Amino acid sequence: MNDTVTIRTRKFMTNRLLQRKQMVIDVLHPGKATVPKTEIREKLAKMYKTTPDVIFVFGFRTHFGGGKTTGFGMIYDSLDYAKKNEPKHRLARHGLYEKKKTSRKQRKERKNRMKKVRGTAKANVGAGKKPKE
């Protein structure tokens, strides 16, 4: 059943500066719903002989009438480069990043402390307490 889905890549570019390959991905899926990103990652991994964990796909838009979806993809040389260069929200989608959430009260107190000072001193107040040495 998955044979009806075709993945094509275009505008392929090797970005040596960021240790990745980047491309536009066209997914042809006539008469079917939009293909999940996990499935696209797995198929790209087979095409480029790598593992799905270093592949990041995003920005998919299905064309009017369905049947064709276009998006963007990047394949990193290693997971370390991916963690270094990818935005945090994309890493979070893969489960590679967890944002630390401060409590509501702490955020409000910090905001009110910052209101009391002006200029460059604001950075010192916003930094919080210094760690004990």
Swiss-Prot record:
Single GO term (MF): RNA binding
UniProt subcellular location: Cytoplasm; Nucleus, Nucleolus
Cross-link (Glycyl lysine isopeptide (Lys-Gly) (interchain with G-Cter in SUMO2)): 37
Region called Disordered, residue ranges: 92-133
Tissue expression remark: Mature tissues, such as adult brain, skeletal muscle, heart, and kidney, express low levels, whereas tissues and organs with significant populations of proliferating cells, such as fetal brain, placenta, bone marrow, and various glandular organs, contain significantly higher levels.
Lineage: superkingdom: Eukaryota
Gene Ontology biological process terms from the UniProt entry: cytoplasmic translation; erythrocyte homeostasis; ribosomal small subunit biogenesis; rRNA processing; translation
Main location: cytoplasm
Phosphothreonine, modified sites: 9
Residue ranges with Basic residues bias: 101-119
Family note: Belongs to the eukaryotic ribosomal protein eS24 family.
Disease listed for this protein: Diamond-Blackfan anemia 3: A form of Diamond-Blackfan anemia, a congenital non-regenerative hypoplastic anemia that usually presents early in infancy. Diamond-Blackfan anemia is characterized by a moderate to severe macrocytic anemia, erythroblastopenia, and an increased risk of developing leukemia. 30 to 40% of Diamond-Blackfan anemia patients present with short stature and congenital anomalies, the most frequent being craniofacial (Pierre-Robin syndrome and cleft palate), thumb and urogenital anomalies.
Functional note: Component of the small ribosomal subunit. The ribosome is a large ribonucleoprotein complex responsible for the synthesis of proteins in the cell. Required for processing of pre-rRNA and maturation of 40S ribosomal subunits. Part of the small subunit (SSU) processome, first precursor of the small eukaryotic ribosomal subunit.
Protein's UniProt name: Small ribosomal subunit protein eS24
